[in-house]
Structure formats: structure tokens, C-alpha cells
Amino acid sequence: MKIVFSIVALVGFTLTLNAQTIQDEELRPDELPAVVIKNAGKDFSVYLPDRNPDVRVRQMQDKFVGYNIGKDFEGHDEYIVLLEADESSLVATYNDTGKLIRVVEKYDNVKLPRSVIFSVYKSFPGWVIVKDKFLYTQADGDILKKQYNLKIKKDNDVKRLVVHPNGEIIAGI
């Protein structure tokens, strides 16, 4: 009987010790924050990264978030930062105080969200997506444009569609 109680106590202590192990969960580098706010003199710059499924989009936005404008903007009414990579570009405009005014992003041949793919194939059965572009524009922390421009083809017919990330077809029907 003493042996049974000893074994139960030993197992109980072992389980409680493992339950108290603290694991540090770090932010993975491929996860961007929902909102990036930077101090620009007396103003604040706001940038909203997109949670796009394409790795190239997230990498470009990560580079932009990590970019430090420093004092380069001094002496200019507007200062433009251009980041380019293979089939992608990001253009950011800063004012004379270093505040982020506008960001325009364009990506070609990106991985499309499931909602966009399902919506297009449901609305256009038998058609194939042959080309796509992702456009993302924001000004002063407000998203102005977030859309996919698609080219679809069936036999010799070609159509151009504009699709919202939630799958809503905006134009081209």
C-alpha cells in the first residue's frame, strides 16, 4: 500500500512539474504586426501591413517596416522611398517632417487567397486564371485600394476581372 501511494505521489509531482514549464513564444519574423506606428517628429506615421498568403508580399512589407528613413527627408517637400524586387514594388511617400503620407504596392503573379480562387471558379466555370496582380494602396493609415486584377481565359476568350480579397467580384462580369 505504501508503494502504491509512493508511485502515485511520484507521478503526480512529475506531471505538475512539467505543467509549469514556461515556453517563450516569440514573434516569428514572417508575422507582421497588424499596425505599425512610427514617430515622425510631432506626428505619427501609420502603416497597415496586409496579411497576404504570398511570401513575397510579406517579405516586401517586412523590409519596408524595417526601413529607417533617418534624416534623409530633411530639405525636401516630399521624400519617396522605392523598394523593388522580382515582380513586386512598393513606393512610399513621406512629407517634409518625415511622416508617411502614402504607400502604393504592386505585386505580379502572387499566391491568391482561397476566397478569390473559389469566387472566380464558381462564377466562371471552365475558365482558367492566367495572370494576376495584387494592388494595395493606403494613405494616412487608411486603406484606399486592396484588390486583385485577374486575367482569365477560356479557349480564345479572355476576360479581365477586379476581385476584392474577400472574393467579391467588383468589375469585369
Feature map (PLM): residue ranges:
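N-terminal trafficking/processing presequences and adjacent post-cleavage segments
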Residues: 21-36, 87-108
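A short, surface-exposed beta-strand/turn
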Residues: 91-102, 159-173
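Exposed beta-strand-loop-beta-strand "reactive/processing" segments of non-cytosolic proteins
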Residues: 51-92, 141-161
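Bacterial Sec-dependent N-terminal signal peptides
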Residues: 1-24
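Short, ordered coil/turn segments that flank beta-strands lining enzyme active or ligand-binding pockets
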Residues: 17, 96, 125, 154, ...
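Long, charged/polar, surface-exposed segments that mediate recognition or autoinhibition
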Residues: 93-132
